[in-house]
Amino acid sequence: MTKVELAKLRTVIPEMRRVRRIHFIGIGGAGMGGIAEVLANEGYQVTGSDLARNAVTERLESLGAHIFVGHSAEHVNEASVVVVSTAIKQDNPELLAARELRIPVVRRAEMLAELMRFRHGIAIAGTHGKTTTTSLVASIYAEADRDPTFVIGGLLNSAGTNARLGSSRYLIAEADESDASFLHLQPMVSIVTNIEADHMDTYGGDFSKLKATFIDFLHNLPFYGLAVVCVDDPVIRGMLPEIARPTITYGLSDDADVQVLDFVQTSNRSRFRVRRKDAGELEVTLNLPGIHNALNAAAAIAVATEDGIGDDAIIRALAKFEGVGRRFQQYGEFETGRGKAMLVDDYGHHPSEVKVTINAARAGWPEKRLVMVFQPHRYTRTRDLYEDFADVLSKVDVLVMLEVYAAGEEPIPGADGRALCRSIRSRGSLEPIFVATPDDVPAVLAGLVGEGDLVLTQGAGNVGALARRLGEMKLSIESMKSGA
């Protein structure tokens, strides 16, 4: 799309014509950066700040955004509006300055809601699978020449970005329940993949409040909108009588409106049938492993079918889907000095996400020894789901445990990496290896990993950078000892 074509798209939100400069505090995150990219391409002057540059900020700078490293009150001067991420603390100098200057301050989801207000919004929520499902929906719509705008929480590999401004009325976006801010969204179609206990501090530790918030999210749909929900999830199944909107269910269950059948996985590819009520069956090849991804694809198929997208476009999009960054992302093989090992990186940081990732690895490569490098994410999550983590992590062959990635939290006694190691060790099936930092992992792996192993780096913190490093290194005990 040329700059002239992009400039014409600014008329998409004429009601925001008084807005000149939009400033993002914490612009380097995938969610914030994605919205900033769409707005920059619409022609708005975008500025932002973060503690360090990264791939997101570099891409935004290439689009003309001005990025500040560090936070300072003067950065918000002359801003029309300030957008803040949930990670920003109340004493941030830019946030304080914006309030003193009476500049409107909105959360990320509020700005996303404004982008969606004048479009046909498709919002994807759920504890797990949001990013992949959003990416699958966006890929199908792109394959069908619907040219959607999308904002995704991870890098869509085929597009090389996590956000794109399209020329059509469609906006496909990931909806974040972590701070309940997804209630700002008013889409035409909403998907809910599953509901489990996570981010419980937001909901006062009350799971019933979390469920009620998801129902409120679905009721933000107009009466003529569409809810697409996974009936396999017991919480969602129990909520069905309370959802007062047109609803399509999907899943493995016989009573699903869109049912996945005959799932078979071979390495990284999956094949299955999809039975659709009133629309016939599809034979699907999905370029992703794991039955959980077949369910994500079923949600995307349900939305696309309901919107009149042809079967050929659906089948093509799923077969050539290139995946999402840090979602079972394969880095090929790397040398260990004891042979070649397969390297995979995954963002999953909830016990259920870790479980399905392990299952996908076992199903696709059953002959390989599974070596996991796991980094817990947040002390509160580790505390709340402690036994679940210990159970699922006991299922790998070799476990290298990192310390908890705090994400701004204070340590909680008994909810750290060493404690998890002790609990796993007490189960008697595995002897975990504790490593304090990702920088120390290569030396440990040099003495552990051998020919034919599958090394899986797992977690939402900085363990993702470790996978990229390993892919570029030739590990050997000698090189690690010499500091090479």
From Swiss-Prot:
Gene3D superfamilies: Mur ligase, C-terminal domain (3.90.190.20), Mur-like, catalytic domain (3.40.1190.10), NAD(P)-binding Rossmann-like Domain (3.40.50.720). Keywords: ATP-binding, Cell cycle, Cell division, Cell shape, Cell wall biogenesis/degradation, Cytoplasm, Ligase, Nucleotide-binding, Peptidoglycan synthesis. InterPro entries: Mur-like_cat_sf, Mur_ligase_C, Mur_ligase_C_dom_sf, Mur_ligase_cen, Mur_ligase_N, MurCDEF_pg_biosynth, UDP-N-AcMur_Ala_ligase_MurC. GO terms for cellular component: cytoplasm. Pathway: Cell wall biogenesis; peptidoglycan biosynthesis. Its EC number is 6.3.2.8. GO terms for biological process: cell division; cell wall organization; peptidoglycan biosynthetic process; regulation of cell shape. GO terms for molecular function: ATP binding; UDP-N-acetylmuramate-L-alanine ligase activity. Pfam families: Mur_ligase, Mur_ligase_C, Mur_ligase_M. It catalyses: UDP-N-acetyl-alpha-D-muramate + L-alanine + ATP = UDP-N-acetyl-alpha-D-muramoyl-L-alanine + ADP + phosphate + H(+). ATP binds at G126, T127, H128, G129, K130, T131, T132. It is found in: Cytoplasm. The keyword Ligase applies. Cell wall formation. PANTHER family: UDP-N-ACETYLMURAMATE--L-ALANINE LIGASE, UDP-N-ACETYLMURAMATE--L-ALANINE LIGASE-RELATED. Belongs to the MurCDEF family. This is UDP-N-acetylmuramate--L-alanine ligase. It comes from Aeromonas hydrophila subsp. hydrophila (strain ATCC 7966 / DSM 30187 / BCRC 13018 / CCUG 14551 / JCM 1027 / KCTC 2358 / NCIMB 9240 / NCTC 8049).
